[in-house]
A protein has these predicted regions:
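Hydrophobic alpha-helical segments within soluble ligand-binding/sensing domains
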Residues: 172-175
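Intrinsically disordered, low-complexity serine/threonine-rich segments
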Residues: 11, 18-19, 41-44, 48, ...
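Short, low-complexity intrinsically disordered segments enriched in A/P/G/S/L with frequent Arg
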Residues: 13-14, 22-27
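Nucleotide and nucleotide-moiety/phosphate-recognizing core
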Residues: 49, 54-167, 177-191, 198-204, ...
Length: 251
């Protein structure tokens, strides 16, 4: 008890010269009269830092997936059924990325976008099984249906026209049908790219969607592909309603 009383009596002494009895003790620590008050602004700074850190983490967890539907193989590149692939390739060009990672039964790319992650996917399953690839990637990266945007061909629209939808049925499109079946949901936004109707009701549908465009149709399609790419990105940034107002209709 003597030591503590003597230290208290000499609290103004130099920390290296505190007398104990007849001698001088080299203090192992700096003695302070009373604890320093913790400045309030430090607490505010630390609080703001962790709130900012948490918000940043939350933003990074918001993932999007854009899917372009089509068939693999060079023989299908310019067919009507591959309009979705052409549109997603255009998105990749705009974002300066390559869709070249082979996984999830598809080719995909990953890019940081608007504070989160964006995945671009080209299923390699052929059109009618596209949902398998979509399900695998979306499940792995935890992308909900509401943030899966699908680009695909629509024979009910003339070349050069786009139509955006928040959700809905497959409408006779086997690729969309497969996605709905695999996800167990039809609540995902989509961008329909007009490729023209069959020239005659008796014309075989498979033959029609696997045919190529005429020169005149191709001329109308090229700007529509560019607008479809912009429309998909706009859905992410502004929502489906704003994107539909901007991009539905003529290219």
């Amino acid at each position: 008890m003597d030591i503590y009383r003597k230290q208290s009596d000499q609290m103004d002494a130099h920390p290296s010269e505190i007398n104990v009895g007849d001698g001088t003790m080299a203090a192992p620590y700096i003695y302070i009269k009373k604890p320093l008050a913790f400045p309030a602004f430090y607490a505010i700074f630390i609080l703001k830092y962790y709130v900012h850190k948490d918000n940043t983490t939350m933003k990074e967890q918001v993932n999007w997936l854009i899917v372009g539907l089509g068939n693999p193989g060079r023989e299908y590149e310019k067919t009507r059924h591959n309009a979705g692939w052409r549109a997603i390739d255009r998105i990749a060009e705009k974002l300066n990325v390559k869709i070249d990672k082979l996984k999830f039964q598809g080719l995909y790319a990953q890019v940081n976008y608007e504070g989160g992650k964006l995945f671009l996917l080209k299923p390699q399953t052929y059109m009618n099984l596209s949902g398998r690839s979509v399900l695998q990637l979306s499940a792995f990266f935890k992308v909900p249906p509401a943030r899966i945007i699908v680009l695909f061909d629509d024979i009910s629209l003339e070349p050069g026209r786009l139509r955006l939808r928040k959700d809905g049925s497959a409408g006779g499109h086997n690729g969309i049908k497969s996605i709905i079946q695999e996800l167990g949901s039809q609540d995902f936004p989509r961008v329909k790219i007009g490729v023209g109707a069959k020239p005659h009701p008796d014309y075989d549908l498979a033959d029609w969607v696997l045919s190529t465009f005429t020169a005149q149709e191709e001329k109308a399609l090229v700007p529509a592909i560019d607008r479809a790419a912009d429309a998909a990105l706009c859905i992410m940034e502004k929502g489906i309603a704003e994107a539909s107002n901007r991009y539905s209709g003529k290219a």
